[in-house]
C-alpha cells in the first residue's frame, strides 16, 4: 500500500514537471509565423493563448527554429493558412527539429492547415505525425461557416463545459477530411465528430465532411499532438478550446475559464456561407470604401450576423471613420466578436474620440473586450 502511494505521488510529480517549465511556471507557447500561415489565423491563435493565465505566447519563424528557439518552448502551434506552403517555408531540417521537439515530451497543436501539415496524406507535403490522412483533397475549397460538432467520451473529459450539449458550433474553413492513415501505424483518439455537411463551393460532393473526425489527438514519442480541422480561435465564445488543446498536449490539468471567455451559446445553429452570401460579402468591401454611414452600419450588422470570415480584415479602420455612428458600430463589432487582436486599436480609438457620447459607448465596448483577458 505504501509503495503504491509513493508511486502515485511520483506520477503526480512527473505530470507537474511536464508543464511547470516556463518562466514563473508559465507554459511557453510558440505560434509559427511563416509564409503559408494566414495573418488573421496567427493573430487569433495568439489571442486564444492569451486567455489562459498559465501560458505565455510568442511567434516563431523558420529562422528561429533553426537557431534553437524550440529549447525555450513547451508547445508549438501551426496555424491555419496553407499547409504545403508552410511545409516549404519550414524546410525539412526544421520539420525534423519539430518532430524531435515533440518526441522529447513537448506538445504540438495543428489548426486546419496545421492539422493538414501533420497528416500522412499521399501527394501532399506533410509531416506524418498525427496518424491521419486527408481524402477528397481535390475539393478542398468546399466552403466555410459556423459548423456543428459533437464530442466523444474522451472529448467530453477535455471540454467538460460542452459535455451536456448534443452539438456545439465553431468556424470551419475548408479543413481536411480525415481518415486513418494506411501507412503510418500511429493510433489517434477522436475527440469530436463533425456533424455538418459542407459542400457549398468547388463542386464538392455531399456527405463528405459530416461524421468525420473534427478533433484528433495522439501520442508521439514522449510528447503529444492535437489536430483540429476547424477554427475555435476564430469563433467568439469558443477561443478557449485552443489553450485547452495545448494543455492536453502537455498533460496539464483542465482548469475553468471565466464565463466571459466560455460562451458556447453565442452560436446554436449552422451558418454556412452560400455563393450568394459570398457575393454579398465581397460587395460590402466597396461599401466600406465608398458607402454612406447608414450603408456601412447595415453592412456591419449583416457581416456580424453571418460571422463573415473576411470582415475582420476590414473593420479595423472603421474605428476611425468620419462618422461617429460608424466608429461606435465598429467598436461594438470588434467587442462582440471577441476580436482581441484589435484591442489596442480600440483603446486608441477611445482615447482620440472627440464625440463624448460616442466615446463613452466605445469605452464600454473596450472594457467588454478587455474582460476576456485574465486578471494580472
Residue ranges and their predicted role:
Residues 291-292, 322-323, 354-355:
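Short inter-helical turns and helix N-cap capping residues of alpha-solenoid HEAT/ARM repeat scaffolds
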Residues 84-163:
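A glycine-rich, often tryptophan-bearing local segment used as a flexible ligand/cofactor-contacting loop or short
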Amino acid at each position: 500500500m505504501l509503495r503504491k502511494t509513493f508511486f502515485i505521488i511520483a506520477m503526480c510529480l512527473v505530470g507537474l514537471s511536464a508543464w511547470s517549465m516556463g518562466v514563473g511556471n508559465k507554459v511557453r507557447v510558440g505560434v509559427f509565423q511563416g509564409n503559408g500561415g494566414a495573418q488573421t489565423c496567427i493573430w487569433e491563435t495568439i489571442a486564444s493563448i492569451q486567455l489562459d493565465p498559465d501560458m505565455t505566447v510568442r511567434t516563431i519563424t523558420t529562422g528561429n527554429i533553426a537557431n534553437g528557439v524550440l529549447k525555450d518552448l513547451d508547445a508549438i502551434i501551426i496555424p491555419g493558412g496553407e499547409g504545403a506552403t508552410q511545409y516549404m517555408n519550414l524546410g525539412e531540417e526544421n520539420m525534423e527539429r519539430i518532430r524531435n521537439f515533440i518526441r522529447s515530451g513537448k506538445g504540438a497543436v495543428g489548426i486546419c492547415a496545421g492539422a493538414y501539415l501533420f497528416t500522412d496524406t499521399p501527394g501532399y507535403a506533410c509531416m506524418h505525425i498525427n496518424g491521419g490522412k486527408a481524402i477528397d483533397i481535390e475539393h478542398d475549397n468546399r466552403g466555410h461557416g459556423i459548423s456543428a460538432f459533437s464530442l466523444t467520451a474522451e472529448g467530453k473529459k477535455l471540454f467538460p463545459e460542452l459535455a451536456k450539449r448534443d452539438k456545439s458550433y465553431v468556424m470551419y474553413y475548408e479543413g481536411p477530411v480525415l481518415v486513418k492513415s494506411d501507412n503510418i501505424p500511429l493510433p489517434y483518439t477522436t475527440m469530436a465528430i463533425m456533424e455538418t455537411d459542407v459542400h457549398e463551393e468547388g463542386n464538392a460532393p455531399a456527405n463528405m465532411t459530416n461524421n468525420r473526425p473534427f478533433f484528433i489527438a495522439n501520442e508521439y514519442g514522449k510528447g503529444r499532438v492535437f489536430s483540429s480541422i476547424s477554427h475555435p480561435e476564430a469563433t467568439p465564445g469558443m477561443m478557449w478550446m485552443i489553450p485547452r488543446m495545448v494543455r492536453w498536449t502537455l498533460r496539464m490539468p483542465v482548469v475553468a475559464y471565466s464565463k466571459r471567455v466560455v460562451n458556447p451559446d453565442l452560436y446554436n445553429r449552422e451558418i454556412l456561407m452560400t455563393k450568394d452570401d459570398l457575393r454579398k460579402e465581397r460587395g460590402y468591401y466597396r461599401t466600406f470604401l465608398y458607402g454612406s454611414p447608414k450603408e456601412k452600419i447595415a453592412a456591419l450588422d449583416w457581416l456580424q450576423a453571418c460571422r463573415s470570415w473576411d470582415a475582420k480584415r476590414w473593420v479595423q479602420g472603421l474605428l476611425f471613420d468620419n462618422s461617429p455612428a460608424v466608429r461606435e458600430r465598429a467598436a461594438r463589432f470588434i467587442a462582440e466578436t471577441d476580436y482581441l487582436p484589435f484591442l489596442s486599436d480600440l483603446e486608441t480609438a477611445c482615447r482620440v474620440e472627440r464625440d463624448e457620447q460616442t466615446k463613452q459607448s466605445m469605452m464600454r465596448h473596450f472594457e467588454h473586450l478587455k474582460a476576456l483577458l485574465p486578471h494580472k
